[in-house]
Regions:
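Hydrophobic ligand-binding cavity/cleft-lining segments
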Residues: 1-41
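Short, solvent-exposed secondary-structure boundary motifs
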Residues: 1-2, 26-32, 47-54, 72-78
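Intrinsic-disorder/low-complexity, polar/charged segments enriched in Ser/Thr/Lys/Arg/Asp/Glu/Gln
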Residues: 3-9, 46, 56, 82, ...
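Amphipathic alpha-helical hairpins
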Residues: 10, 32, 69-70, 115, ...
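Hydrophobic pocket/interface hotspot
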Residues: 19-23, 29, 47, 61, ...
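Residue-level recognition of beta-strand termini and adjacent short loop/turns
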Residues: 41-43, 91
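Hydrophobic-ligand binding "helix-grip"
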Residues: 52-94, 102
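A conserved amphipathic terminal alpha-helix motif
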Residues: 102-131
């Protein structure tokens, strides 16, 4: 069963080009992750980390649509998922950002991961707002 988790849309204090550039180098992602994210490792195109009670997750950049959308996909993860970062220009110095995570989950798994994923999205977007 396809399950979507969506963040609120927030305003980042970077224009869409600068934010896109930061998010397409996964080494920069550590600066935007909540403090409760553990075991973060990265290179330019891949990263892995652990969130609360969830298993360790690994991501790679799958698609880039200049200054608008980045699609990440899971690799070597017990729970396969895609994560999308949507970026749109707000004004010349800021952009609107939202994050979406899509997973194939049965009902039981959805109940187990719903809270940690939503907490992660809330904290992640709060950090993006402070950029």
């Amino acid at each position: 069963m396809s399950t979507n988790f969506k963040s609120q849309e927030v305003i980042a204090n970077l224009n869409s080009k600068d934010l896109f550039t930061k998010f397409t180098d996964l080494n920069n992602l550590k600066d935007y992750l909540p403090s409760d994210v553990e075991e973060f490792e990265s290179n330019t195109d891949n990263c892995s980390f652990k969130i609360e009670s969830l298993p360790k997750m690994s991501l790679r950049i799958k698609e880039k649509h200049a200054f608008k959308k980045i699609k990440f996909e899971s690799i070597k993860s017990q729970i396969p998922f895609n994560m999308f970062c949507y970026i749109s220009e707000n004004d010349k110095d800021s952009s609107k950002v939202s994050i979406e995570i899509n997973m194939e989950l049965n009902f039981m798994m959805k109940m187990l991961v719903k809270k940690p994923i939503n907490i992660f999205l809330d904290r992640f977007t709060e950090i993006i707002k402070k950029v």
